[in-house]
Amino acid sequence: DPFQCLAVCINLSEAVRSSSPETSVSHIPVHQDGSCNGLQHYAALGRDKLGAAAVNLVAGEKPADVYSGIAARVLDIMKRDAQRDPAEFPDAVRARVLVNQVDRKLVKQTVMTSVYGVTYIGARDQIKRRLKERGAIADDSELFGAACYAAKVTLTALGEMFEAARSIMTWLGECAKIIASENEPVRWTTPLGLPVVQPYRKIGRHLIKTSLQILTLQRETEKVMVKRQRTAFPPNFIHSLDGSHMMMTAVACRRAGLNFAGVHDSYWTHACDVDKLNRILREKFVELYEAPILEKLLESFQTSYPTLLFPPLPERGDFDMRDVLESPYFFN
């Protein structure tokens, strides 16, 4: 934002010109952002070492870029496919066309929306738009085929790098489907004790006839939307966890005398308190995930619906959550 940039420039120039820059007063909120925060929460839930490294839950010499990491995997797959015989593997031709198009920008939107359960069709349309912007493939049918192939490869790469995230996402969706099939909305309680209910119900139409006209009213019925309950639960559950992390951080900042503001995975404080906020937000993330979150969720489902059979919890890795405390790029 140009005005934010201007404000920082003015503030910085005042400090530099001051006889004592270190005591110069600054009211600028300094932002610290998560690294693909939804995937950070999935990696923590799954104790996934590979996923944790990709989204900066562990220390590194430089920030890990999950989008570049996925792009590199996609490129490797396409290079292998390009070597195959088109007579046996028709996508080999598409791979040869796309190897020069694969970059961070091509896959970024799909990686970002993977946390929200992006479908194959959604990924295909996202990648098709990126390819169309570049004008690399003129023929519409060839563009569509290339987008289909690229979407399939991108989702494969995501599944390989974030295997634990995919299994947890699937498990959450299956639990939601089982509950919604009983015409019940999915309910859960966040780690901070906030009860949540997914409000998705089918819409009914009611006709009201008057002497002048016929009015149609749309109102929710008692019938829940099974598909939407299933697809919405994984992202909604993750959002309830990132909201819990923010609230825990905000409360700790208040107790420590820090000014705090934030939007989603962007936490703000004044320049003099950046190091303190860094420490607090890491400590609260570790505290959040040292609790058995998925175990408690399954237990609550089994208690609320004792006659229903839920799938077992997905397998998890052995990532040490306390590594987050030493990761400089977890939020930066």
Swiss-Prot record:
Keywords: DNA-directed RNA polymerase, Nucleotidyltransferase, Transcription, Transferase. Transmembrane segments: none annotated. Pfam families: RNA_pol. One of its GO terms (biological process) is mitochondrial transcription. The active site is at 33, 108, 265. PROSITE patterns: RNA_POL_PHAGE_1, RNA_POL_PHAGE_2. DNA-dependent RNA polymerase catalyzes the transcription of DNA into RNA using the four ribonucleoside triphosphates as substrates. The gene is RPOT2-SYL. GO terms for molecular function: DNA binding; DNA-directed RNA polymerase activity. InterPro entries: DNA-dir_Rpol_C_phage-type, DNA-dir_Rpol_phage-type, DNA/RNA_pol_sf. It catalyses: RNA(n) + a ribonucleoside 5'-triphosphate = RNA(n+1) + diphosphate. The keyword Ribosomal protein does not apply. It comes from the Eukaryota. This is DNA-directed RNA polymerase 2A. One of its GO terms (cellular component) is plastid. The keyword Transcription applies.
